[in-house]
C-alpha cells in the first residue's frame, strides 16, 4: 500500500499565475492540472515500486505525464498560490470549502463554470487527500460596482453547490 505524505492539487490558472509570479517555467503549465503526491521511505526498491504504481494509476486516469518533479521547484509553486493571486489582484475572495474527496472534480468544473458565468478568474488549489478546496476569486480589472454585484451571486451558487455535495464552508481541514 501507498501512504502519501500529502496529495495536493492546482488548477491550470493557479499554475500559470504561480509561474508568472515566480518567473520560472513549470512543466506542462500550458495545459492540465497538477496533482502533487509526496511519498517517503527508506527502501529505494519499495519507493521505485510505488512510483511505478503511481505512474500506472495516473496514466490510466488520464494524466498527460507523470514525473518526479524537482521538489523545491514544485513546492515553491504550490506554496506561492496565495501570494501569486494577491500579486495578480489585490482584491479577491478566498473561498475555503471542503467536500468528499470524490467530489473534487465536480467542484473544479463548477468553479470553472461559475468563473465563466460571472466573468471572473478563479484559481484553485486543494489539499486533495482531505477534500479541502481553496478557490481564490479574483476581481482584477472588473469595475468595483460590478464586483460587488456578482461576487455574492457567485458565492450563493458556490455555497449551495458545496452543500449539495455534503460539503461545508471553512474547510480547514477535511471531511474527506
Task: Say what each PLM segment does.
Residues 1-176:
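Noncatalytic alpha-helical scaffold of FAD-dependent oxidoreductases
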Amino acid at each position: 500500500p501507498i501512504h502519501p505524505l500529502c496529495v495536493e492539487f492546482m488548477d491550470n490558472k493557479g499554475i500559470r499565475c504561480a509561474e508568472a509570479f515566480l518567473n520560472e517555467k513549470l512543466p506542462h503549465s500550458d495545459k492540465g492540472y497538477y496533482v502533487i503526491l509526496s511519498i517517503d521511505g527508506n527502501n529505494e526498491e519499495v519507493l521505485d515500486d510505488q512510483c511505478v504504481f503511481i505512474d500506472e494509476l495516473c496514466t490510466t486516469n488520464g494524466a498527460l505525464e507523470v514525473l518526479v518533479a524537482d521538489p523545491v521547484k514544485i513546492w515553491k509553486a504550490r506554496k506561492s498560490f496565495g501570494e501569486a493571486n494577491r500579486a495578480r489582484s489585490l482584491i479577491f475572495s478566498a473561498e475555503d470549502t471542503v467536500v468528499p474527496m470524490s467530489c473534487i472534480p465536480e467542484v473544479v468544473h463548477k468553479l470553472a463554470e461559475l468563473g465563466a458565468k460571472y466573468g471572473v478568474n478563479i484559481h484553485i488549489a486543494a489539499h486533495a487527500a482531505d477534500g479541502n478546496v481553496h478557490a481564490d476569486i479574483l476581481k482584477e480589472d472588473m469595475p468595483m460596482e460590478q464586483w460587488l454585484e456578482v461576487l455574492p451571486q457567485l458565492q450563493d451558487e458556490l455555497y449551495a453547490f458545496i452543500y449539495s455535495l455534503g460539503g461545508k464552508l471553512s474547510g480547514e481541514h477535511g471531511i474527506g
